[in-house]
Amino acid sequence: VWAVFIAMAAVLLIERAGVQYSAGQHKLGMLAANDAVPASSALFGQKPTCLVITDTDQAGVEDVKEQFDQILLDMKIAHRDVDLSLDGADAIPSLTSYDRVILLMPSLDGLGTHLSDIMSWVSAGGSLMFAMPPDNSSYLQVIAPKLGIESAGYDYVTAESIVPGEDFMIGGGQRYELSDPFDSSLSVSLRESAHVWAKTGDAGTPLVWSNECGSGRTVVCNIGIYDMVMRGFYAAAISLLGDATAYPVINGAVFYLDDFPSPVPSGDGTYIKRDYGLSIADFYAKVWW
């Protein structure tokens, strides 16, 4: 029996003796920090393809505008701003040179007849986004079918969580709790033509939906919360305004250090001193962190 094993080992040794292993040399090219182009520089001189219409006289709009300025900068979308409170509705330019319009205002009354012009532009192939839950006014009721709205109430409901669709964004299909929720979302019932991309986890209130309107498209964000952590949801909603959106994928990892940084207690801990032979400060720096 031993002779058989020895013979097999000898055969394997002879068979593998001619096999040479070598490791390939891989080098990852890194872009020098001073060669990286800031987003603001990359957008400089670019022709705006997005028109953002705001009315900073309305409550909360100025803060929302600040968030969307950052979102559009991060997405490198060149845009032009028109503030109804400063410029007036007549400052809204011809929409023929734009492929998307974002309305940053709950009340549509200030648009006047320009709202009809915008909706005609959408029907001809433009894309329109309502970034804030719209007030239920006569203006909204006129255009509601084009937004995919069957009926809208005058009350607002609590958005305690958000459940994005799996085809809406990475991480879709899961429920995400919203901190400090309040009655922020307009109570609406949608038409069958509307495509709901995100909803609340409890009552299923539509939070983000789109609707085909003629040759164009409308997108409504009914979230009503604009904390920094919500930027990803609004960026995903902006991506619905086009047929395709490019975004970077970073091959990286994040490590979270518990309680870092924090004040370090002085002195020695009984068990830390016994088990590690270190002071509390040294244990924090050399072991825990």
Residue ranges of model-derived segments:
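Hydrophobic membrane-insertion alpha-helices, especially the h-region
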Residues: 2-16
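Short hydrophobic beta-strand segments
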Residues: 42-60, 254-256, 263
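A glycine-rich, often tryptophan-bearing local segment used as a flexible ligand/cofactor-contacting loop or short
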Residues: 108-177
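Catalytic beta-strand/loop cores that center a nucleophilic Ser/Cys/Thr
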Residues: 159-217, 222-227
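Active-site beta->alpha N-cap acidic-glycine motif
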Residues: 226-233, 240-289
